[in-house]
């Protein structure tokens, strides 16, 4: 079987990458990096709708330019009253975090799989798609607090809010813990250690919405069950100036189906006809189903208000050399890139919490 070069692997990762050969070491040139990143954005329903920024520097600022409202003034012939409207400038600071996705394929697999010589291409395409899915997951759910997780020790004391790892699971203490054996009654399980290693990369939009946007607790509305008032309360939390037809509900497929079940039950019990438009557009705002979004929140914003920043520093490497490759008869691959997740206007966001479990 003919060995494939770094360039061939990059071309397999994205069929749109057809520009000149790679620089040494698998680094993509700016045009290749742009096309590769674009392919990862196309892998998920939300990523293709958000704002993308490609920068040469890994840290920096993104300009925000805007104008105020009610700027018009009455004109008086042959008179300059000295009035001038202004332009509002702002900055979004970003700092891209490096991430990687490594994988390996044995030479035996390459020789004997049913896909034949296309196997390497198929796997690389799958990995490229997974990069897009994982990045969207991080953009939504990332939380840098998981970097503070420490292995539980019976000789240590822990305060409320501390994070510990125990039996490969992560817990947050809800009560102070004195030295002694681990007691699950003092803490809430948050996920696995692998989840924490993944989520600690960056702070995602869910966390940013909760810390700086409009938080709408609906636990007091029908015990958090899906009703129409949930959406209207969320919509009222966002200032009218942002309610200009570009807002979208972001929710998990399960949450979207729970809303559909509620509205159909209403039609059955109360009578009447529910159009698809009413199901698909609660409070006249379209829904975007986002598989990576947790079931316990609903987000409201213009997708273009969500920003993902990448640098051009994308590297795709493959090696068939070195002791491991020789002794284990394997090929090793890795994709390196970086990103940051921002919200341009937190005032233009709402997040609905306190929803009943489904």
Positions of predicted regions on the chain:
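Tryptophan-rich substrate-binding surfaces of secreted polymer-degrading and adhesive proteins
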Residues: 148-196
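Intrinsically disordered or highly flexible coil/loop and linker segments, enriched in small
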Residues: 46, 132-144, 244, 268, ...
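Short, flexible beta-strand-to-coil junctions
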Residues: 166-168, 174-176, 253-255, 302-304, ...
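Beta-edge loop/turn motif
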Residues: 245-257
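Alpha-helical scaffold segments that mediate packing/assembly in large oligomeric complexes
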Residues: 107-151, 155, 159, 192-237, ...
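Assembly/oligomerization interface modules of large self-assembling protein complexes
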Residues: 20-104, 124-125
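Short, polar loop/linker segments at the starts of domains and inter-domain junctions
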Residues: 79, 122, 181-188, 219-225, ...
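Sequence/fold signature of self-assembling virion shell proteins
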Residues: 2-20, 24-43, 53, 58, ...
């Amino acid at each position: 079987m003919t060995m494939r070069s770094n360039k061939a692997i990059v071309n397999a990762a994205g069929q749109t990458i057809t520009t000149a050969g790679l620089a040494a070491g698998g680094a993509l040139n700016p045009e290749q990096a742009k096309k590769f990143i674009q392919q990862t954005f196309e892998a998920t329903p939300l990523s293709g709708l958000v704002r993308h920024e490609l920068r040469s520097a890994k840290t920096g600022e993104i300009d925000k330019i805007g104008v105020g409202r009610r700027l018009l003034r009455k004109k008086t012939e042959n008179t300059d009253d000295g009035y001038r409207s202004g332009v509002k400038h702002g900055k979004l600071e970003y700092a891209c975090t490096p991430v990687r996705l490594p994988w390996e394929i044995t030479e035996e697999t390459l020789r004997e799989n049913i896909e034949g010589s296309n196997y390497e291409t198929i796997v690389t395409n799958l990995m490229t798609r997974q990069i897009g899915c994982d990045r969207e997951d991080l953009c939504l759910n990332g939380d840098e607090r998981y970097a503070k997780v420490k292995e539980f020790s019976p000789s240590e004391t822990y305060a409320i809010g501390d994070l510990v790892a125990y039996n490969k699971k992560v817990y947050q203490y809800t009560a102070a813990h004195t030295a002694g054996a681990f007691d699950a009654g003092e803490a809430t399980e948050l996920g696995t250690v692998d989840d924490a290693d993944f989520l600690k990369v960056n702070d995602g939009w869910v966390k940013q919405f909760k810390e700086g946007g409009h938080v709408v607790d609906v636990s007091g509305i029908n015990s958090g069950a899906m009703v129409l008032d949930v959406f209207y309360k969320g919509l009222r939390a966002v200032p009218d100036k942002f309610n200009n037809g570009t807002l979208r509900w972001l929710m998990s497929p399960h949450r979207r189906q729970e809303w559909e079940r509620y509205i159909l039950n209403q039609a059955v019990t109360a009578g009447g006809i529910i159009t698809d438009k009413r199901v698909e557009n609660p409070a006249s705002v379209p829904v975007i189903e986002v598989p990576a979004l947790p079931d316990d929140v609903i987000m409201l914003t213009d997708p273009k208000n969500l920003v993902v920043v990448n640098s051009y520093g994308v590297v795709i490497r493959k090696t068939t050399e070195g002791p491991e490759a020789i002794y284990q008869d394997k090929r090793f691959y890795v994709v390196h890139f970086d990103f940051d997740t921002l919200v341009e206007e937190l005032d233009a966001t709402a997040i609905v919490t306190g929803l009943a479990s489904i």
